[in-house]
């Protein structure tokens, strides 16, 4: 597989996770998933930035993305995309990638609170990598992602994450660019 194809296939595979991450930001707000509770260190468990509404819509749109991927793959693009999943497999993988990505964000927020980072404060690497690591962990219970794709995503995702955050900031969807 050449580099361009590897980048495209990797991006195509992880797209439900990227979508979930973006839609959680766009549709977030409301009740935080930690219910304003503190951990044993008396700091918030996660913070106000991770909400039930954002999580629901993130996962929902991640699954919708997976369904669209299935439809596109059945338009004759299977030879490009390297995946031959059924509709139900796309839905399961879309759910696992989406929920895994958002769980990774929650875990990252949990770690940031323990390390003394305030909500919205940048934590380089942690902000960019936890969502992709957990998306890959969650999906691996159903589908073992080829190592080439996993490694590509671990390298590609921080760049995509930073660029998408800058775009969201410029569009007024985020308060900070990171």
UniProtKB/Swiss-Prot annotation:
Pathway: Membrane lipid metabolism; glycerophospholipid metabolism. The keyword Cell cycle does not apply. The chain crosses the membrane at residues 7-27, 56-76, 91-111, 125-145, 149-169. It is a multi-pass membrane protein. Keywords: Cell membrane, Lipid biosynthesis, Lipid metabolism, Magnesium, Membrane, Phospholipid biosynthesis, Phospholipid metabolism, Transferase, Transmembrane, Transmembrane helix. Its cofactor is Mg(2+). Its main location: membrane. GO terms for molecular function: CDP-2,3-bis-(O-geranylgeranyl)-sn-glycerol synthase activity. Belongs to the CDP-archaeol synthase family. Catalyzes the formation of CDP-2,3-bis-(O-geranylgeranyl)-sn-glycerol (CDP-archaeol) from 2,3-bis-(O-geranylgeranyl)-sn-glycerol 1-phosphate (DGGGP) and CTP. This reaction is the third ether-bond-formation step in the biosynthesis of archaeal membrane lipids. This is CDP-archaeol synthase. It comes from Methanococcus vannielii (strain ATCC 35089 / DSM 1224 / JCM 13029 / OCM 148 / SB).
